């Protein structure tokens, strides 16, 4: 079936290991309830009617993905990821077909809310560069002295945001910016940073702070709490 300008492809880079989780199992394959974190993250994307396909970039040596129901899902495409996140995203973009817009979502960010996703997707009607979900910084921020666990100074938090995912951009623009940034040796920490490097200014779409990324062991219980609460709210 041919895509329309409203159809969106999502790319999920899932080739990382996540050593801060202190576990032999890659964090995206840890379970919350009866599903892995990766499954929760992908199903949140597919729950929106505009998301027609999800491309998941996994490690070439990954033997776990094939055991998941996702492996046989008709809307899922699997590609080999790279050593770095940007390499995996580029591999996903190449498999995104003719989708005009793409979402990029962390494999270990399972608590995405549908209202946040809908507001992010609405950027395709008003923006040529796209944007990201983000949360305003609420805590006092401190800059450490170089090489020391000592405060150098307090950072003004006004105008500071925590970057979240999904991040949402025109497919060709993201591909070109990632390619240029990598070729020129730029440091790419997320997809938006590639656009910033090329002179673009993506929009900030305020999202819920409970859209957490599971990075450390204590995050797993917190994500389970948020997911359980969300499911309860949707069923009442």
Swiss-Prot record:
Pathway the protein contributes to: Isoprenoid biosynthesis; isopentenyl diphosphate biosynthesis via DXP pathway; isopentenyl diphosphate from 1-deoxy-D-xylulose 5-phosphate: step 2/6
GO biological process per UniProt: isopentenyl diphosphate biosynthetic process, methylerythritol 4-phosphate pathway
Alphabetically ordered keywords of this record: Cobalt, Isoprene biosynthesis, Magnesium, Manganese, Nucleotidyltransferase, Transferase
Annotated site residue numbers, Positions MEP for the nucleophilic attack: 157, 213
EC number(s) on file: 2.7.7.60
Effect of residue 27 to A/S: Strong decrease in activity
Highest rank taxon of the organism: Bacteria
GO molecular function, one term: magnesium ion binding
TM ranges: none
Effect of residue 140 to I: Loss of activity
Pfam families found in the cross-reference section: IspD
Site feature Transition state stabilizer, where: 20, 27
Effect seen on changing residue 213 to S: Decrease in activity
Reaction catalyzed: 2-C-methyl-D-erythritol 4-phosphate + CTP + H(+) = 4-CDP-2-C-methyl-D-erythritol + diphosphate
Cofactor: Mg(2+); Mn(2+); Co(2+)
EC primary class: transferase
Signal peptide: none
pH dependence (UniProt free text): Optimum pH is 8.3.
Function field: Catalyzes the formation of 4-diphosphocytidyl-2-C-methyl-D-erythritol from CTP and 2-C-methyl-D-erythritol 4-phosphate (MEP).
Assembly behavior: Homodimer.
Family (UniProt): Belongs to the IspD/TarI cytidylyltransferase family. IspD subfamily.
Note: There are no coordination bonds that occur between IspD and magnesium in any of the complexes examined to date.
Protein name: 2-C-methyl-D-erythritol 4-phosphate cytidylyltransferase
Species for this entry: Escherichia coli (strain K12)
């Amino acid at each position: 079936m041919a895509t329309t300008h409203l159809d969106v492809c999502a790319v999920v880079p899932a080739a990382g290991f996540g050593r801060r989780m202190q576990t032999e199992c890659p964090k995206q394959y840890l379970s919350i309830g009866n599903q892995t974190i990766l499954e929760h993250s992908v199903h949140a994307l597919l729950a929106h009617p505009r998301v027609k396909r999800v491309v998941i970039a996994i490690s070439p040596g990954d033997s776990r993905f094939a055991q998941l129901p996702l492996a046989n899902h008709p809307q899922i495409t699997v590609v080999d990821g790279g050593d770095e996140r940007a390499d995996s995203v580029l591999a996903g973009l190449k498999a995104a077909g003719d989708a005009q817009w793409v979402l990029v979502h962390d494999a270990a960010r399972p608590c995405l809310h549908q209202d946040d996703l809908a507001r992010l997707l609405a950027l395709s009607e008003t923006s040529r560069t796209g944007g990201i979900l983000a949360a305003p910084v609420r805590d006092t921020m401190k800059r450490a002295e170089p090489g020391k666990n000592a405060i150098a100074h307090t950072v003004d938090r006004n105008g500071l945001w925590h970057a979240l995912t999904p991040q949402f951009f025109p497919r060709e623009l993201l591909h070109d910016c990632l390619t240029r940034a990598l070729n020129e040796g730029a440091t790419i920490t997320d997809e938006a940073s590639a656009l910033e490097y090329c002179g673009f200014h993506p929009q900030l779409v305020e999202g819920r702070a409970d859209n957490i990324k599971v990075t450390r062991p204590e995050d797993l219980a917190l994500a389970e709490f948020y997911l359980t609460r969300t499911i309860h709210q949707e069923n009442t």
